Amino acid sequence: MEVLPGTTVGIRVSDGVVLAAEKRVSYGLYLMSKSGKKVYRILDKMGMASAGLMADMQTLARIVEAEMRLYELDSNISPKVWTVAKLLSYILYERRLFPYYAEIVVGGLDEEGSHLYSLDPIGAIIEDDYVALGSGTQLAISIVESNYKKDMSLDEALSLALKSVYAAMKRDAASGDGVDVLVIGKSGTLEKTYPLSELQSVAV
């Protein structure tokens, strides 16, 4: 299967999860936009991020958010992170002959703790402590793998995610133009965009 454009990183620590993705939208050699959003908040303590085609990312995010909010209303309980990942797996596998061009990472907090899952375009699920997806994977994962510690803080995980995506942006032509992050912790959830000018001082 072809490598999907962009760079997305997810990191899990005991206190929560960090999802990060750069903002460049490219089709082949053409730069479509410098302000694409590839990180999505699904529920208060859950989110997803993706690499691939923007239309497919947005479609999947809308479907999952709608289904999970209906689940909350119908059952009066908050879904587990695994529930979100499994729903995405069903959706992706159902379209395996004409797949969505998206690799996805799902992360969040539930009553069992923090969780991080990666899914390929046809729905295989892998749970891990960290993951990198997209065309900048090799550059990003080398940074994460060299610096990740199970006992690191959420702030340290955020710094590592920014550093890894920024490293990919400097060498991968399909990645660039800033980073969106979703930080999901026990004390709350933070969504923030880091422009290039800020990244140069933060991702060190």
Curated annotation (Swiss-Prot):
Regulation: The formation of the proteasomal ATPase PAN-20S proteasome complex, via the docking of the C-termini of PAN into the intersubunit pockets in the alpha-rings, triggers opening of the gate for substrate entry. Interconversion between the open-gate and close-gate conformations leads to a dynamic regulation of the 20S proteasome proteolysis activity.
Gene Ontology MF annotations: threonine-type endopeptidase activity
InterPro entries, per database record: Ntn_hydrolases_N, Pept_T1A_Psome_bsu_arc, Pept_T1A_subB, Proteasome_bsu_CS, Proteasome_sua/b, Proteasome_suB-type
KW Hydrolase (keyword) present: yes
PROSITE patterns reported for this sequence: PROTEASOME_BETA_1 (PS00854), PROTEASOME_BETA_2 (PS51476)
Subcellular compartments: Cytoplasm
Main subcellular localisation: cytoplasm
GO BP, sorted A to Z: proteasomal protein catabolic process
EC number: 3.4.25.1
Active site: 7 (nucleophile)
Keywords per UniProt: Autocatalytic cleavage, Cytoplasm, Hydrolase, Protease, Proteasome, Threonine protease, Zymogen
Catalysed reaction, written as an equation: Cleavage of peptide bonds with very broad specificity
Propeptide: 1-6
Pfam families listed in its UniProt record: Proteasome
Gene Ontology terms: cellular component: cytoplasm; proteasome core complex, beta-subunit complex
Entry keyword annotation includes Cytoplasm: yes
Segments forming a coiled coil: none
Function of the molecule: Component of the proteasome core, a large protease complex with broad specificity involved in protein degradation.
Complex and partners: The 20S proteasome core is composed of 14 alpha and 14 beta subunits that assemble into four stacked heptameric rings, resulting in a barrel-shaped structure. The two inner rings, each composed of seven catalytic beta subunits, are sandwiched by two outer rings, each composed of seven alpha subunits. The catalytic chamber with the active sites is on the inside of the barrel. Has a gated structure, the ends of the cylinder being occluded by the N-termini of the alpha-subunits. Is capped at one or both ends by the proteasome regulatory ATPase, PAN.
Protein family according to the UniProt entry: Belongs to the peptidase T1B family.
Full protein name: Proteasome subunit beta 2
Originating organism: Thermofilum pendens (strain DSM 2475 / Hrk 5)
